[in-house]
Structure formats: structure tokens, C-alpha cells
Amino acid sequence: MTAQNMKLSARIPSIRSREGLVSFVGALRKDLETNRNDWENPTLEDFLEAMEAWIGSMGRFYANKGQPVPQSPTWEMFAHILHASKIYE
């Protein structure tokens, strides 16, 4: 994981509002513009395919964290989905 990717990942637990997610999405967009080669899924098609796959298997992500999958989506969960879609294969 690159240093920039680690910075993005570190922001996720503090995302508790729509405004926080807006800021995070802006940071993801900027990261794509400046670090495109670090993205496994730089095209919209690849990004959405990875998003679909990650959402389908995100139970393992939460199990690895020792947490249940939230019953209702949260701003933080949406940020996890977006961030994972950047790199999920």
C-alpha cells in the first residue's frame, strides 16, 4: 500500500457526515488525477466492477475487523466501499 493510499485509508474511520464523505471523494478524485498508476481500477467500468465485487464480499472485511456488517449503510461504510473499489481485484 502506497503512502498516499495509507493516508486515504486512515481518513475513513472519522467520516461521520455527508460533508466528510464529500471531502473524502474529493481526495479520491485528486489521488486518481495525481497517482493514476497506483489505481488497480482507474476506469469507471473497472471501478464499478470492483465495487460490485467488494460489496458482495465485504462481510469478510468486517469479519477481519471483528465487527458485524452494519445493517444500515453509514457514511464510513460508503467511504470503505469507494476506497476498496480503487484497489480491489
Labelled PLM ranges:
Residues 64-89:
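Amphipathic alpha-helical binding modules
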Residues 50, 54-60, 64-67, 72:
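N-terminal accessory alpha/beta regions
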Residues 26, 49, 63-64, 80:
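Intrinsically disordered, low-complexity regions enriched in small/polar residues
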Residues 2-56:
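Amphipathic alpha-helical packing elements
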Residues 32-35, 58, 62, 85, ...:
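Amphipathic alpha-helical interaction segments
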